[in-house]
């Protein structure tokens, strides 16, 4: 546009200067900020979050009778499933509890390993 100057301040941050000298700052060229300026969360963290959301949606869809309209905390078994799905990306191998170990800490061998009230 004639008379307007666009300057890059840093990636995804631009100033637009109008002919009268007034300026505006435009972030992400007007796109969604959390996508265009995503510098806060690495992809691994986002993958965990999206996996939690996806498993929660599947749980709600396949078991609607267990979830009347309300707000729920993600069940521990699903949270632990997401963690297990991401172990390879960390180069981690997880062993299975022996029955006596599970009994000692008061959980089932297959989990979940934390009580429902526990918050990570």
From Swiss-Prot:
Note on cofactor: Binds 1 NAD(+) per subunit.
Q: Which UniProt keywords apply?
A: Cytoplasm, Hydrolase, NAD, One-carbon metabolism
Q: What InterPro entries does its record include?
A: Adenosylhomocyst_ase-like_sf, Adenosylhomocysteinase-like, Ado_hCys_hydrolase_NAD-bd, NAD(P)-bd_dom_sf
State its location(s).
Cytoplasm
Cofactor(s) required for function per UniProt: NAD(+)
Give the EC number(s) listed in the UniProt record: 3.13.2.1
Q: Where does NAD(+) bind?
A: 34
Give the first-level EC class, as a single word: hydrolase
Pathway of action: Amino-acid biosynthesis; L-homocysteine biosynthesis; L-homocysteine from S-adenosyl-L-homocysteine: step 1/1
Q: Does the keyword NAD apply?
A: yes
Q: Which reaction does it catalyse?
A: S-adenosyl-L-homocysteine + H2O = L-homocysteine + adenosine
Query: What GO biological process, any one, is recorded here?
Result: S-adenosylmethionine cycle
Q: Which GO cellular component terms are attached?
A: cytosol
UniProt-listed Pfam families: AdoHcyase, AdoHcyase_NAD
Query: Can you tell me where the transmembrane regions are?
Result: none
Provide any one GO MF term from the record.
adenosylhomocysteinase activity
Family from the record = Belongs to the adenosylhomocysteinase family.
Q: Which PANTHER family does the protein's record reference?
A: ADENOSYLHOMOCYSTEINASE
Q: What does this protein do?
A: May play a key role in the regulation of the intracellular concentration of adenosylhomocysteine.
From the Swiss-Prot or TrEMBL record, give the protein name: Adenosylhomocysteinase
The organism is: Streptomyces fradiae
